[in-house]
């Protein structure tokens, strides 16, 4: 889904087969399938899952430093989300958007939400007894517990830095993503109008805004750190705003959208400027700074190094997959194995938190097992997450009944909120600039 899709149907990077697609009667260029983007999802989600619970699997400090940087990698998910959203809603080699996609902006929004909310609702409801028990064991009042339930089901938790990691902590991502989906019907058509020059300036501007936020956090705390497992930030709420806030997520999503549009405006003979492998390795190698004297905090690594390199990687692997002989890494991420694993990224992401709480949340594990599970159990936990993700994907995410119900709900919600994302009195066309140009 949105994990980018975050595996969702509406975000699938497949507007048609490259071999079978034919130009439409209106002469618009058909978009080829780029499965390699879907295959990249698993390479992001698996280290994030590792990072959340690796401290229960090893005492090796170097490994812990290296693998507990999930807050760096999550930027890649936002970039992919924006990349796919722009690719599926704007026109190839044209400075325009697909009017049909945004004809009903409310429907666009609710379809996006319904591509991930059913699984979130299912896991939240099945896990509610455990989540509520945890709240009560932590001496939270029933009022606080009720507020946590409301924030979880309404996907509003990312707006509240003190509550962002309630119940199923990784779902703050969905909370931030929902706000971005709310804004995209207004923003993407404007981005689609930009030339390559305008898109480049937009990328620079958005990156600068993102960097300012990270500089603000770093100035308030410090620029260097030993890793989240070794030291805690002195300003946890500021840290939550820095990594969770929906506005920050929107900036990174739009970076991905601008990158996709830049590639979509390439001419047919445009070649990749570099083997995508080097950009992929460089982006992940930025995590290695944690093992050096240049051990910048996660926020700085994410914005200064990982995001620019990973976004450039997405652009080049996109270009490369359109070539007659794509590079090995492009074929690998576009392979059946990686696209299948990419489809598991979203259910694994949603499930790994509750499963981890069962085995590693102290108050819960003590009640169930007498204590947290030993380190030798950690590989079995990872296997359980993958198996659970597979069955959830096969029997819930792919379920025709679930998809039909989601589509029906999206339609009903769109009808109920008609006009929410559009002006009931659109402005009449203003010809003043045309008259001025003529004069």
Predicted features by range, described:
Residues 34-35, 62-74, 163-176, 216-255, ...:
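Interfacial loop-to-helix transition and helix-capping segments at the boundaries
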Residues 5-28, 411-439:
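Non-transmembrane, juxtamembrane loop and terminal tail segments
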Residues 116, 135, 153-216, 243-246, ...:
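Hydrophobic alpha-helical segments with transmembrane-like composition
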Residues 189-198, 263-274, 295-297, 329-332:
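Membrane-interface helix-boundary motifs at transmembrane edges
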Residues 71-78, 90-136, 141-155, 178-184, ...:
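Transmembrane alpha-helical segments and their boundary/interface "anchor" motifs
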Residues 71, 129, 245-249, 253, ...:
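Alpha-helical transmembrane segments of multi-pass integral membrane proteins
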Residues 46-53, 129, 158-159, 206-219, ...:
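Aromatic-anchored segments of alpha-helical transmembrane domains
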Residues 33, 61-63, 86, 103, ...:
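Membrane-interface helix/loop caps of multi-pass membrane proteins
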């Amino acid at each position: 889904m949105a994990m980018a899709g975050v595996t969702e149907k509406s975000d699938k990077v497949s507007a048609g087969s490259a071999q079978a697609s034919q130009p439409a009667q209106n002469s618009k260029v058909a978009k080829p399938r780029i499965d390699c983007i879907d295959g990249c999802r698993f390479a992001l989600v698996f280290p994030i899952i590792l990072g959340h619970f690796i401290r229960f699997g090893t005492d090796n400090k170097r490994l812990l430093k290296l693998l507990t940087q999930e807050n760096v990698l999550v930027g890649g998910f936002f970039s992919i989300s924006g990349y796919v959203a722009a690719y599926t809603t704007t026109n190839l080699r044209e400075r325009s958007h697909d009017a049909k996609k945004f004809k009903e902006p409310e429907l666009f929004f609710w379809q996006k939400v319904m591509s991930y909310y059913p699984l979130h609702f299912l896991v939240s409801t099945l896990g509610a007894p455990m989540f509520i028990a945890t709240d009560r064991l932590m001496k939270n009042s029933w009022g606080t517990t009720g507020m946590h339930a409301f924030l979880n089901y309404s996907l509003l938790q990312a707006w509240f830095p003190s509550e962002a990691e309630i119940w199923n902590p990784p779902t703050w991502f969905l909370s931030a993503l929902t706000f971005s989906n709310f804004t995209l019907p207004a923003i993407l058509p404007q981005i689609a109008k930009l030339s390559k020059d305008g898109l480049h300036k937009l990328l620079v501007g958005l990156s600068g805004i993102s960097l300012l936020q990270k500089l603000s956090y770093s100035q308030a705390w410090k620029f260097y750190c030993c890793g989240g497992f070794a030291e805690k930030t002195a300003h946890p709420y500021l840290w939550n705003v820095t990594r969770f806030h929906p506005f920050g997520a929107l900036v990174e999503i739009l970076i991905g959208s601008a990158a996709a549009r830049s590639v979509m405006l390439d001419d047919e003979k445009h070649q990749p400027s570099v083997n995508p492998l080097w950009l992929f390795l460089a982006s992940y190698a930025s995590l290695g700074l944690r093992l050096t004297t240049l051990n910048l905090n996660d926020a700085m690594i994410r914005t200064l190094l990982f995001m620019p390199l990973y976004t450039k990687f997405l652009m080049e692997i996109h270009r490369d997959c359109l070539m007659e002989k794509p590079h090995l890494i492009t074929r690998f991420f576009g392979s059946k194995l990686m696209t299948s694993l990419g489809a598991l990224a979203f259910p694994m992401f949603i499930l790994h938190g509750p499963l981890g709480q069962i085995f590693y949340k102290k108050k819960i594990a003590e009640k169930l097992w007498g204590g947290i599970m030993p380190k030798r159990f950690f590989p079995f936990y990872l296997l359980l997450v993958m198996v659970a993700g597979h069955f959830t994907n096969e029997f819930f995410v792919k379920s025709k009944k679930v998809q039909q119900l989601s589509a029906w709900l999206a339609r009903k919600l769109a009808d109920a909120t008609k006009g929410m994302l559009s002006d009931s009195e659109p402005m009449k066309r203003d010809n003043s600039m045309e008259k001025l140009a003529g004069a």
